[in-house]
């Protein structure tokens, strides 16, 4: 069975000199939470930006749910919005005029899912991170 996220021999070269990523491979099994940990400048953010489709790898392959979304050698490059993937940036800013629930559901509005399914998914995520009781509060009320 394929992993929901499979990265093989990923390489990203921005310019002359050392590559930002050189031969990174990993798989994230279903239900797992994985941390990319390392010193500043080691390629963590570049790796995630390649997975999300915000950077184009120089070589290697990225598959999401068994579907190849990036393979320069095969001429495959699926755009970010078509990857069925979300990303929270390191400097993520919330929408201050929205509630916690509205901030969480916002990215789902671009997906082809019903409002009921989106509401269910948001409730599950808020429960998972212990924020259910704050769902309808203004997001700026969180510290």
Predicted regions and their residues:
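A short, flexible loop at the N-terminus of ABC-type nucleotide-binding domains that lies
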Residues: 1-7, 12-23, 30, 73-77, ...
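Pre-Walker A (P-loop) beta-loop-beta motif of ABC nucleotide-binding domains
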Residues: 24-35, 95
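The feature captures the beta-strand-to-loop junction immediately N-terminal to the Walker
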Residues: 37-39
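Helix-to-loop junction immediately C-terminal to a conserved catalytic motif
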Residues: 52
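ABC ATPase NBD Q-loop/coupling interface
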Residues: 61-83, 113-114
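Conserved ABC ATPase "signature" region
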Residues: 67-71, 109-134
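Short coil-to-helix segment of the ABC ATPase nucleotide-binding domain corresponding to the Q-loop/switch region
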Residues: 98-107
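Conserved ABC ATPase signature
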Residues: 138-142
């Amino acid at each position: 069975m394929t992993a929901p996220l499979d990265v093989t021999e990923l390489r990203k070269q921005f310019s002359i000199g050392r590559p930002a990523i050189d031969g990174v491979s990993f798989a994230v099994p279903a239900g797992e939470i994985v941390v990319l940990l390392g010193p500043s400048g080691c390629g963590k953010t570049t790796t995630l930006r390649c997975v999300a489709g915000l950077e184009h790898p120089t070589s290697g392959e990225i598959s999401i749910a068994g579907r190849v979304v990036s393979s320069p050698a095969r001429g495959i490059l699926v755009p970010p919005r078509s990857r069925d993937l979300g990303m929270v940036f390191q400097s993520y800013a919330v929408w201050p005029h929205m509630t916690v629930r509205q901030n969480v559901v916002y990215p789902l509005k671009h997906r082809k899912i019903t409002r009921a399914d989106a509401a269910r998914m948001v409730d599950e995520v808020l429960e998972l991170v212990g924020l259910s009781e704050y769902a309808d509060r203004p997001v700026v009320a969180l510290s």
